[in-house]
Amino acid sequence: MPKDYDRSYFDRWYRDPARRVASRAALRRKAAMAVAVAEHFLGRRVRTVLDVGCGEAAWRAPIRALRPDVSYLGLDSSAYAVRRFGRSRNVRAGSFHELAALRFERPFDLVVCADVLHYVPAPELSRGLTGLAALCGGVAYLEVMTREDDPEGDLRGFLKRPAAWYRHRFSTAGFAACGSHLYLSPTLAARSTTLERAPR
């Protein structure tokens, strides 16, 4: 039976102090790190952000607090999130595997995909990564828990895959790891120095 990403789901895992796995302060720090790394490698301010599997668009506020003029687009499969936040937070309907077919006017400076990929089946993940690499012109924040970790929170549908499995797929798509769940786009990876990139 598929999960229903309705309001009660987000209440349980993102707002309930007894169950949520990350605080707002932690999210602000992640956003600041992702923006800073993207701007370092781009050599300019972040202008565009794509948030894949954005849910209620929790990343939007901390990013806009840093860069008020940023253009933010969220994609999520939750009908509730799209209905409630579509206009106010620019959240549109979309699933990870659909990224292979999506194209926009230009690539995004920062792509966020947090707490999503460890629920995505392998065939869909492989298809989506190809599209994600094409949509990312700067840096991607791909937060994933692996078999080697001890994840908390929603474990229903969690796929216990080894870190090496993800590293191989990210690398095959053209991403280069640069630490702390951050990956350089294929374009930036080609311009980076050896020690800026994590070993494959």
Regions found by a protein language model. Give the residues of each.
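A conserved beta-strand element that flanks and buttresses the S-adenosyl-L-methionine
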Residues: V112
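Class I (Rossmann-like) S-adenosyl-L-methionine-dependent methyltransferase catalytic domain
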Residues: M1-F104, V120-R200
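Short catalytic micro-motifs in class I SAM-dependent methyltransferases
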Residues: D115-V116
